[in-house]
Amino acid sequence: MGVILLNSNNNNHEQQRSLDEINNTINFNHNDSASQKFLAFLGPGLLVAVGYMDPGNWITSMQGGAQYGYTLLFIILISSLSAMLLQSMTVRLGIATGMDLAQMTRHFLNKPVAIMFWIIAELAIIATDIAEVIGSAIALDLIFGIPLIVGALITVFDVFLLLFIMKFGFRKIEAIVGTLIFTVLAIFVFEVYISSPQITDMLNGFVPHKEIITNQGILYIALGIIGATIMPHNLYLHSSIVQSRKYDRHSIHEKAQAIKYATIDSNIQLSIAFVVNCLLLTLGAALFFGTKTEDLGGFYDLYLALKTEPALGATLGGIMSTLFAVALLASGQNSTITGTLAGQIVMEGFLKLSIPNWLRRLITRSLAVIPVIICLIVFKGNTEKIEQLLVFSQVFLSIALPFSLIPLQLATSNQNLMGPFKNKTWINIISWLLIIVLSGLNVYLIIQTFQEL
């Protein structure tokens, strides 16, 4: 790691504040009651949870349930616990140092290497955006019959919707994201209830099974679930937005309080994401496991399978499939909001460059829409090819993941930077193991994906 330049004399006062327009804007009084402090910090975790229930996770979870029943619920549990640990590290990084992960990575690396990391981070955000464009465009097609190419172009106007919402303050964004998340949650709770899953089999799914390792097919889906869980942009995002609360930046006690309640918020919201992913897998298992429709390839397959499932009947099948599309649209809109903020954090953090938000968002979304449009034109609207592009975007995110995880680990284990908030030894051991395992699994997934082409 010869490129790493540890700057022991870090000075937070010389560092531009992360997301300056929202930084230190939301009241937090450490003298309030525990419930008031919790409510003050409730919100950033919602934006982070979006990345754990994005369109890329949907196919993997439902296909896992359809093909292998409830066996992979254990993998969702382990993935969610790993996510909680890594996101708690970003919380401590942001609050303890006053820097987000992009700023900290720039602080760690010499300029040429930092620029390389910035390019990878930007490409990761574009890859994330591609999934959002595809998910939203497919949802618009399923609900309203809007052609995919028109739906993809419509998503460009999400830029202006977010800019309009931002005028009303960051709390409003948190509220809107929370509303959309609970819309998705409510839809899948209803759909799972209607599908009448076997509760005993569900509970048994949280127990590790040797088939996860011995069965090649189960292992591949398991790796897909794990590899898609930790999103690079979430690590940048979370380390910044936790700084939106007002607390004394020079008080160790107030920082400790802020870290405590921000971590509680994160764990609660990631628990909701865990439930949503379990519901997706359960829905796939309850309706399609052991049937001829168990090989669900994409959103259109899922929609059609729900609509025509004999056990549901025509009316209920129509309702279930429509609600599925509505949830997909809500998920896409949520990811738009978080992707915008993450893009701004990355550009400002790595380059110390601020451009108008509307221009930043327009550039990112345009770069995401262009590959989708080209794919639609070249393959004449072939839905299978457009969903394959979504898979490619997830593969690139897997490649980009170590470039955000390693700086996070190095920073949070550094005494000079973190002071009393540095990683404990057991956290260092687990986080390095996670980095090695996740990186190895992602490499395996990438190889498998290209072999299947």
Curated annotation (Swiss-Prot):
A Pfam family recorded for this sequence: Nramp
Keyword Iron: no
Cellular compartment(s): Cell membrane
GO terms, molecular function: cadmium ion transmembrane transporter activity; manganese ion transmembrane transporter activity; metal ion binding; symporter activity
Transport among keywords: yes
Record-level GO cellular component terms: plasma membrane
TM annotation in the entry: 39-59, 66-86, 114-134, 146-166, 175-195, 217-237, 270-290, 310-330, 362-382, 388-408, 427-447
Keyword annotations from UniProtKB, A to Z: Cell membrane, Ion transport, Membrane, Symport, Transmembrane, Transmembrane helix, Transport
Example GO BP: iron ion transmembrane transport
Highest taxon of the lineage: Bacteria
InterPro entries tied to this protein: NRAMP_fam
Positions of disulphide bridges: none
Membrane topology: Multi-pass membrane protein
General function of this protein: H(+)-stimulated, divalent metal cation uptake system.
Stated family: Belongs to the NRAMP family.
Protein name, UniProt field: Divalent metal cation transporter MntH
